[in-house]
A protein has these predicted regions:
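Membrane-interface extramembranous regions
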Residues: 1-167
Length: 167
């Protein structure tokens, strides 16, 4: 394998940038997720403001066998998402916040199966705009998994970590 050595200035710059990313990446990820959940949650308090509200309301109504009407479902979902957003902003109760997030994501994916004619033009390869909106949530789930890996004090390291195993 050929490796080329970078000039000294480039290596120093690369190390500084990598160090900055390691120091701030998790915080920025947490805040970015918080913005998404808070913003989308607040939209659900205003009828017609969220492009996903009709599908979300029908999904919850279907999952609860009609016990929770669509308008009530949207208010519950709005509070739920705002709570997740605030928890992420404040970096408080992260285990509970991430649990709420994962449960919400399970609910978010169900329209792909409950309403495939609305979420795909050709099932399962060509999603509609609503389907794409749902499928992109894999990025949110992956981000939450990364944050979850830090609830016990884990962190990012800008340098390789060599694990030593007891012999």
């Amino acid at each position: 394998m050929l490796t080329t050595r970078q000039p000294g200035w480039f290596d120093r710059l690369d190390r500084r940038i990598t160090q900055w990313m390691a120091e701030h990446g998790l915080t920025l990820l947490r805040l970015a997720l918080g913005v998404v959940f808070f913003w989308f949650g607040v939209l659900k308090f205003f009828p017609g403001a969220s492009p996903a509200e009709e599908l979300a309301g029908r999904t919850i109504e279907t999952l609860t066998f009609g016990l929770i009407p669509e308008d009530v479902a949207l208010r519950i979902l709005a509070v739920w998402e705002v709570a997740i957003g605030l928890g992420l902003f404040l970096s408080r109760w992260m285990r509970a916040v991430l649990l709420l997030l994962f449960v919400q994501m399970l609910g978010t994916i169900t329209p792909l199966f409950l309403f495939p004619s609305e979420t795909f033009t050709i099932f399962p390869v060509a999603p509609t705009l609503e389907g794409q909106y749902i499928i992109k949530n894999v990025v949110i789930v992956a981000s939450a998994i990364v944050l979850g890996a830090t609830v016990r004090g884990g962190e990012l390291s800008p340098e390789p970590v060599v694990e030593t195993r007891p012999t």
